[in-house]
Swiss-Prot record:
Species assigned in the record: Geotalea uraniireducens (strain Rf4) (Geobacter uraniireducens)
Name of the gene this protein is made from: fluC
Domain of life according to the entry: Bacteria
Protein name, as recorded: Fluoride-specific ion channel FluC
GO molecular function, one term: metal ion binding
Family: Belongs to the fluoride channel Fluc/FEX (TC 1.A.43) family.
TM helices/strands, residue ranges: 4-24, 32-52, 67-87, 101-121
Keywords, in A-Z order: Cell inner membrane, Cell membrane, Ion channel, Ion transport, Membrane, Metal-binding, Sodium, Transmembrane, Transmembrane helix, Transport
Topology relative to the membrane: Multi-pass membrane protein
Length: 124
């Protein structure tokens, strides 16, 4: 039951974080490209690398906390479904170049940021 509580609490925090972070990014950069979704997914990619690597090396992160942070918080923060929908809408609007850039940049950047999170965790 403790694990479920961690997931629920951190999930709510992750959802709220996505709402505010993506909204802020859209205010800064506009909506010509799905910048808000891109930003939350990059942050999530970095955090999953950091959390998973750190939790494997340290007893400071309990299994329940790790699950709460990754499944709960990062599950609420990141969004593959919105990424898919926004990319589909770009394709539907004839924006093949922007849609392709979104797929390429999102996947490659998230992989790089996951790796950076792992590097940072190893340095801690």
């Amino acid at each position: 039951m403790e694990t479920v509580l961690y997931i629920a609490v951190f999930g709510a925090l992750g959802c709220l974080s996505r709402y505010y972070l993506s909204g802020w990014v859209y205010e800064l950069f506009g909506r010509a490209f799905p910048y808000g979704t891109f930003a939350v997914n990059i942050v999530g990619a970095f955090c999953i690398g950091l959390i998973m690597e750190f939790s494997l090396r340290s007893a400071l992160v309990s299994p329940q906390l790790r699950i709460g942070l990754t499944i709960g918080f990062l599950g609420g923060l990141t969004t593959f479904s919105t990424f898919s929908y926004e990319t589909f809408r770009l394709l539907e609007d004839g924006e093949l170049l922007i849609a392709s850039a979104n797929v390429l940049f999102s996947v490659m950047t998230c992989l790089v940021f996951t790796w950076l999170g792992i590097i940072v965790a190893k340095a801690l």
